[in-house]
Amino acid sequence: MFYEFALIGTTASGKSSFSIELAKEIEAVILSLDSLCLYKNIDIASAKPNKNELSIIKHFGINLVYPDSHFCVGDFIKEYHKAKEFAISKNCPLIITGGSGFYLKSMLKGLSPKLEKIKIELNNDEIWSIAEKIDPNFTSKFSKNDEFRLHKWYQIYKLTNEIPTNWLVKNTSAPTIQNLKIYELNWDKEELKNRIKNRTKIMLNSGLIDEAKKLFTTYPKDIKALKSIGLKECGEYFEAKLGDIKSKEAILNLENLISIHTIQLAKKQRTFNSGAFKDRIILDTKSLKVKHFLDKYLNL
C-alpha cells in the first residue's frame, strides 16, 4: 500500500540507518533529503548509504549530478515526483529522509517565483527599519539577523513595489505535499556531539582526505559542493593552513575543525526543524526500535 512520511533530524542523528531498517520491514523506497548525497563522487563526506545498502533498498535523490552541476529546489521536487510515482506503481510506502529541511519545507509550503538579483545598497538595520513600518507580519516572524530572508524581503520590495508578505501570498505555488506525517530523531546535545566526533573519525579513517583530494583536483575549488562541511576543511588542510600536511597535528586539527563545524550545523538544523515543522512528532532515540515505531506510529 502506498503512503508517505518523513524522517528528519540533525546530521549524525542516525536517519539513514533507521530509515533503511524501516524500509526493509515495510518494503518501502527512500527519497534522500540531503543536499550533498545528490552529488556523484561525494560518498564519504556526504555519509551516503553504501553500495550494499543502495542495492537492497531503492533510493531516489542520490548520485543525480556531478559536483559542478547546478541543482535547485525545483530539481528536487521533480525527483520527489519520480519517487512518488515509482512507489505508487509498486504499491509500496515512500520514506522521505535527510537533513536538508529546506527542501522539505519548500514542498510543504510551495515555491515563490525566482526573482532577478539586485544590488543591496542598504545595510540590514536600514532594511529592517523599512520592514517594521510596512510589513509587520514579516518582522514578527523573523529576526533582523537573518540576512538571507532580510535581503530576499528587500529584493521583493524593490522589484515589485508591493508589501513582500502580501506578494508572496499571491505568488507562491501550491504545496507539493499536503498532510505529511513528520518524525524527528532527537538526541541529547552532548550525546549528539559525541556521535558527531565519532562519525568524523570514521570518515577520516574511511578515506575522506583521498576523496577530497580527487574532488579538489577534478573540480574548481570555489564550487558550492566543495564548500560543504568535511570538504572545505580538507581544502584548508591541502593548503597547509592547518599545519604541515605530513604531520599528525594537521590531521588532528582537521578532525577537530570538521567536528566543530558539524556541531554548529546540527544546532542550526535543530533550530530550523523546530520552526519549520511545528507539528512534527519527536522520537526518543534512546528507546527507539523499528518494531516499536511500526507498532506505535504506523499501526503495523
Swiss-Prot record:
Repeat is among the record's keywords: no
Segments for region (Interaction with substrate tRNA): 34-37
Catalytic activity: adenosine(37) in tRNA + dimethylallyl diphosphate = N(6)-dimethylallyladenosine(37) in tRNA + diphosphate
Gene Ontology terms describing biological process: tRNA modification
Documented EC number(s): 2.5.1.75
Stated family: Belongs to the IPP transferase family.
Function: Catalyzes the transfer of a dimethylallyl group onto the adenine at position 37 in tRNAs that read codons beginning with uridine, leading to the formation of N6-(dimethylallyl)adenosine (i(6)A).
Descriptive protein name: tRNA dimethylallyltransferase
Organism of origin: Campylobacter fetus subsp. fetus (strain 82-40)
